[in-house]
Amino acid sequence: MQHLHSNLEVRVVSGKGRCVFAARHIAKGQLVLADPIIFVPGSESDHTDQTSVGRYVFQWNEDDDLCVVLGYGSLINHGLPENVSLVSNYKDQTMEFYALTDIKAGDELLYDYGHDSEELTGYYGIPSPAVA
């Protein structure tokens, strides 16, 4: 299991909270993080929305199972265009984050949470994009 935190830093950004930034250049396709997870069976997934942990769960597989990522990965914010993708590593029980593009030092790491803008605003407090 690899932890590549020397490439990253966490900063507090007004209006967003904690955010993960590249501390140095990260090449497209590079493994950025491989964080351990806590598995949450699908049968318990309805309860996560009723706790503060609910904002930090990720889809683990196609069977509606979830996981809590233990590391910087849980602090990566929603944003478009996203610059990292997620891969569930079932063998090592880790969530892996890969660079979708070259990421410059100082850029925030972002991925698409996959929710509609109403849910992003209501649940996560992310403002809806401006309508032209």
Locate the predicted segments by residue:
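Conserved catalytic SET/PR domain of SAM-dependent protein methyltransferases, capturing the structural core
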Residues: M1-A132
